[in-house]
From Swiss-Prot:
CDD domains: ASKHA_NBD_actin
Coiled-coil regions, chain positions: none
Name recorded for this polypeptide: Actin-42
More info: There are at least 13 actin genes in potato.
This enzyme's EC code(s): 3.6.4.-
Domain of life the protein comes from: Eukaryota
Record key words, sorted: ATP-binding, Cytoplasm, Cytoskeleton, Hydrolase, Nucleotide-binding
Length: 332
């Protein structure tokens, strides 16, 4: 969250709401009934954590309202009734969801004006393009969204229910094989950090399994040190081979290709030449090269393929929103 015209968000926090697992023992401690974001994260040991956004779509409106309240009043410190708001939504978000979002903004927060934009379209704007295909992968969902001259092509959008959270779960599982135990919602957050700091994507997975001898260490919050080797690239490999976790789905490369193939034959060349990665789950080192290699193998042999992985892609949806909301034409 942040302000239009800024080049980076002012507030970045996980969309988590935590509630105490046990009622307070200490009298007069003024215990809150719910914690949001980083505070929920830091007190995660005594809380049960809930994610109100599942697979990119809001499923728990009461908790979502708490998150928005926290955003306005604690993070940005603004009065929502004084500022127009730009919200984003997942591609193919049900219309009822958008209506509910609008209702809460106007009725609960009294915003003077609002607009809802599709996330992937904003990522493309942030990359300075109006035509291309965005492979956006966050925590709960991945999408491939072909966009032509600024308009998303809904018939060719594909959704893949495979994203950051699944990779974290998989890493929890393969670390268990090494004899480390991570089970609670709080420990999942530790594993997520391991994933973000140490994972990478192999250009050739089979070869990497043979060659890989490098081991890295990671210090847990309690001081214990764990060692991680092939797990580093085995974890995000799931993006290209969902069958590893028993999912019957196409990988992100094949989903991108399938999306392009659902588009008019005349615009495919423009899409192949502008494949833009966005979202936190595309932050793994090696992802652009691997994506390029896999799509080259699927595409017609003379096709020029370009995979763009902007350095700020973790926040490119937000940056695109900042650009859009600061345009004078948009404000009218």
């Amino acid at each position: 969250a942040g302000f239009a015209g800024d080049d980076a968000p002012r507030a970045v926090f996980p969309s988590i709401v935590g509630r105490p697992r046990h009622t307070g023992v200490m009298v007069g401690m003024g215990q809150k009934d719910a914690y949001v974001g980083d505070e929920a994260q830091s007190k995660r040991g005594i809380l049960s954590l809930k994610y109100p956004i599942e697979h990119g779509i809001v499923s728990n409106w009461d908790d979502m309202e708490k998150i928005w309240h926290h955003t306005f009043y604690n993070e940005l410190r603004v009065a929502p009734e004084e500022h127009p708001v730009l919200l984003t939504e997942a591609p193919l978000n049900p219309k009822a969801n958008r209506e509910k979002m609008t209702q809460i903004m106007f009725e609960t927060f009294n915003t003077p004006a609002m607009y809802v934009a599709i996330q992937a379209v904003l990522s493309l704007y942030a990359s300075g393009r109006t035509t291309g295909i965005v492979m956006d992968s966050g925590d709960g969902v991945s999408h491939t969204v072909p966009i032509y001259e600024g308009y998303a092509l809904p018939h060719a959008i594909l959704r893949l229910d495979l994203a950051g959270r699944d990779l974290t779960d998989h890493l929890m599982k393969i670390l268990t094989e090494r004899g480390y135990s991570f089970t609670t919602t709080a420990e999942r957050e530790i594993v997520r950090d391991v994933k973000e700091k140490l994972s990478y994507i192999a250009l050739d997975y089979e070869q990497e399994m043979i060659d890989s001898t490098v081991e890295k260490t990671y210090e847990l919050p309690d001081g214990q040190v764990i060692t991680i080797g092939a797990e580093r690239f085995r974890c995000p490999e799931v993006l290209f081979q969902p069958s590893i976790i028993g999912m019957e789905a196409a990988g992100i490369h094949e989903t991108t290709y399938n999306s392009i193939m659902k588009c008019d034959v005349d615009i495919r060349k423009d899409l192949y030449g502008n494949i833009v990665l966005s979202g936190g789950t595309t932050m793994f080192p090696g992802i652009a090269d691997r994506m390029s290699k896999e799509i080259t193998a699927l595409a017609p042999c003379s096709m020029k393929i370009k995979v763009v992985a902007p350095p700020e892609r973790k926040y490119s949806v937000w940056i695109g929103g900042s650009i859009l909301a600061s345009l004078s034409t948009f404000q009218q």
